[in-house]
Amino acid sequence: VNEDTQSIRIDSREQHDLLLQFSREFMPKAADKLQLYKGERPIFDLLSGDEEIARALGRRDDHKSGGYLVVDQTEALTTVDVNTGGYVGARNFDDTVFKTNLEAAQAIARQLRLRNLGGIIIVDFIDMSRDDHREQVLAEFRKQLARDRVKTTAGGFSQLGLVEMTRKRTRESLAHMLCEPCLACGGQGIVKTARSVAYDVLREILREARQFTPREFRI
């Protein structure tokens, strides 16, 4: 919680009261920002929480322009691959690549925060033939990274056209917290943990309970 935090919404009165008591004692500035959510719609629906989590757990992150990112996380490092996809918004190929990379520079910085990715990160932007385009993309990327509260450092383009960067590890990534290795594919993929699935089911039950008056739920 810092000066940029506008509000903290909590949909449980019990948890709200506990956090309020805690914040008044240890974090007085945060107490005024706590809000008890009393709306009819589940708070995750209101803020598209499930959709955002699903996007942050997926390998592919699609953009409105048609371009997309492919994010792969391994034990050693994380790679981010930029692709044009169906983007046809520019007059020529160079402009298409430039616009896609510029949009990706903003999206990558956001995905690093959402997924809480740390350690060594390799970004493979689409090859650009013009030096000024590379400089503008790198400047935009560093500008977006500067907004991150976690320490990040980004180098320039390597001879292979890759950007190497590091982001300080503060805790486990989102995928490591919510997922576990997939046994069906020998650990090459990931699936949600039993706890994560249980929370999904609970939110769905609450969603249905607010619309109907069922006598029981069978799972």
Which functions belong to the PLM regions below?
Residues 1-219:
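DE-rich acidic low-complexity regions and acidic surface loops
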